[in-house]
């Protein structure tokens, strides 16, 4: 209960909704907007819970403090301006909050997330809380560099147009020596792939130190380029235990002429990622981003952060590629939801579309796009669906789907390249890949023994599990 004091303010505890629940508020163009899915504790009204989220993620604390008189809370407080029941869910609500622009440091994803997903997620009045979406205002967007280069510049660097890019994660992910690792890279690139990739947990272990890997891989890239007359690359993972070590590895990659490096942006952190992205832009290096740890954060429907938020934040922090799921492979991803955040990664302007989980219209103010990477449990039979779903501005990455070929790495790469080229030709001729995709692959098998062997090996492989990431 609040009470007046000699210092001229009402001390004590008062309901959050008295200050932070403002249903008559109309958000400004400069406000950062957030949509939370909240599950209040029994007995807590949704208006009080929504106001508590607004307070604890902006200017509020658990009690009135006299220093409130030293600032203009009306200018700086977050405002819960709308609450909607979540369809088909008991005691769950979408809570919409507007935050004034001045609450956030320019060009800092770290600062935005510290406010929005900080202490409030441990708040006792809430049983669960999930950040579903953010609308970054253009005024804030313009303070971020974004992707080092973006999709259009990457295409020009590679001189590859009119089709998705093809990649492969080198397997086994751990245990190879640097020389054998470089051999696998060469065979895959020579067989027809555009890129190969370090797995997310390859850093600098006793069996393969980073410098040795970088040198053998660069030798493989240059040899494959000379023999195919195509630009090739390998995502050298520069993620390290410290930012200083990460930048040392990135600098060495630049010195040996590698075209692209890689970072694990969630385990490495947004501050490290933004630092690396700025370096990559300054030095003409592409930046591939892996999302290791994302499912810990985004897989539960009622608590955490949705991946569309992480994807938006990564685009602002900086990344030319980002893993996005496959829809058809072994990793989580329902089609409508996945394509919603894929559009948020690569399009300049995305309209609100609740059917795809997009709660706000987002204008990126001409910021370059991030290319989605489809990776995880995919093989040649998936190629028509992947081309139809993701389109040209994507990277299709086959790890086991390349290296698991019965004839070896290079034939596995050739099988994937033939399947891709066949699908692109069929699409350009007006054929419907969703309906005729398997026929397209079978026809291509007649003139590619490598593809025929791959199709025979993986004809029975499916990953039929219900997607958890649904509306």
UniProtKB/Swiss-Prot annotation:
The record's free-text note on cofactor binding: Binds 1 Mg(2+) ion per subunit.
InterPro entries named among the record's database cross-references: RuBisCO, RuBisCo_large_chain_AS, RuBisCO_lsu_C, RuBisCO_lsu_C_sf, RuBisCO_lsu_fd_N, RuBisCO_lsu_N_sf, RuBisCO_lsuI
Subcellular location: Carboxysome
Gene3D superfamilies named in the record: Ribulose bisphosphate carboxylase, large subunit, C-terminal domain, RuBisCO large subunit, N-terminal domain
Post-translational events: The disulfide bond which can form in the large chain dimeric partners within the hexadecamer appears to be associated with oxidative stress and protein turnover.
Any Gene Ontology CC annotation: carboxysome
Requisite cofactors: Mg(2+)
Recorded catalytic activity of this chain's protein: 2 (2R)-3-phosphoglycerate + 2 H(+) = D-ribulose 1,5-bisphosphate + CO2 + H2O; D-ribulose 1,5-bisphosphate + O2 = 2-phosphoglycolate + (2R)-3-phosphoglycerate + 2 H(+)
GO biological process annotation, one example: photorespiration
One of the record's GO molecular function terms: ribulose-bisphosphate carboxylase activity
EC number, UniProt record: 4.1.1.39
Further comment: The basic functional RuBisCO is composed of a large chain homodimer in a 'head-to-tail' conformation. In form I RuBisCO this homodimer is arranged in a barrel-like tetramer with the small subunits forming a tetrameric 'cap' on each end of the 'barrel'.
PANTHER family xrefs: RIBULOSE BISPHOSPHATE CARBOXYLASE (PTHR42704), RIBULOSE BISPHOSPHATE CARBOXYLASE LARGE CHAIN (PTHR42704:SF17)
HAMAP family reported in the protein's UniProt record: RuBisCO_L_type1
Similarity section: Belongs to the RuBisCO large chain family. Type I subfamily.
Record's protein name: Ribulose bisphosphate carboxylase large chain
């Amino acid at each position: 209960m609040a009470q007046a004091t000699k210092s001229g303010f009402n001390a004590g505890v008062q309901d959050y909704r008295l200050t932070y629940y403002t249903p008559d508020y109309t958000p400004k163009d400069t406000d950062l907007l957030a949509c939370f899915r909240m599950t209040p504790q029994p007995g807590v009204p949704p208006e009080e819970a929504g106001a508590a989220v607004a307070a604890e993620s902006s200017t509020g604390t658990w009690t009135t403090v006299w220093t409130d008189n030293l600032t203009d809370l009306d200018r700086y407080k977050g405002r819960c301006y709308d609450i909607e029941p979540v369809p088909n869910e008991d005691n769950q609500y979408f809570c919409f909050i507007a935050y004034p622009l001045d609450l956030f440091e320019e060009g800092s994803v770290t600062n935005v997330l510290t406010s929005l997903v900080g202490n409030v997620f441990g708040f006792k009045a809430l049983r669960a809380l999930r950040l579903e979406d953010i609308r970054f205002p253009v005024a804030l967007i313009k303070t971020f560099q974004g992707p080092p280069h973006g999709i259009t510049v990457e295409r020009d660097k590679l001189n590859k147009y009119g089709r998705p890019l093809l990649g492969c994660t080198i397997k086994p992910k751990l245990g190879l020596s640097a020389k054998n690792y470089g051999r696998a890279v060469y065979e895959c690139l020579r067989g027809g792939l555009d890129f190969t990739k370090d797995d997310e947990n390859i850093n600098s272990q006793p069996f393969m130190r980073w410098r040795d890997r970088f040198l053998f891989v660069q030798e493989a890239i240059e040899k494959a380029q000379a023999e195919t007359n195509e630009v090739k690359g390998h995502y050298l993972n520069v993620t390290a235990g410290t930012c200083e070590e990460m930048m040392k590895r990135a600098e060495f990659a630049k010195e040996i002429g590698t075209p692209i490096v890689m970072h694990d942006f969630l385990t490495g952190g947004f501050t490290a990622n933004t630092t690396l992205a700025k370096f990559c832009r300054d030095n003409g290096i592409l930046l591939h981003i892996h999302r290791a740890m994302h499912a810990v954060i985004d897989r539960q429907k009622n608590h955490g952060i949705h991946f569309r938020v992480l994807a938006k934040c990564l685009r602002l922090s900086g990344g030319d590629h980002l893993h996005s799921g496959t829809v058809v492979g072994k990793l989580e991803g329902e089609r409508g939801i996945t394509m919603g955040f894929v559009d948020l990664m690569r399009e300049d302007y995305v309209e609100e579309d609740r059917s795809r989980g997009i709660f706000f219209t987002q204008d990126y103010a001409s910021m370059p796009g991030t290319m989605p990477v489809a990776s995880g449990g995919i093989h040649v039979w998936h190629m028509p669906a992947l081309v139809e779903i993701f389109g040209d501005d994507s990277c299709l990455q086959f790890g086991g789907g390349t290296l698991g070929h019965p004839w070896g790495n290079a034939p596995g790469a050739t099988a994937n390249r033939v399947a891709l080229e066949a699908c692109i030709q069929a699409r350009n001729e007006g054929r419907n890949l969703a309906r005729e995709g398997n026929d397209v692959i079978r026809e291509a098998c007649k003139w590619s023994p490598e593809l025929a062997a791959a199709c025979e090996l993986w004809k029975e492989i499916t990953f039929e599990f219900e997607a958890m990431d649904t509306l």
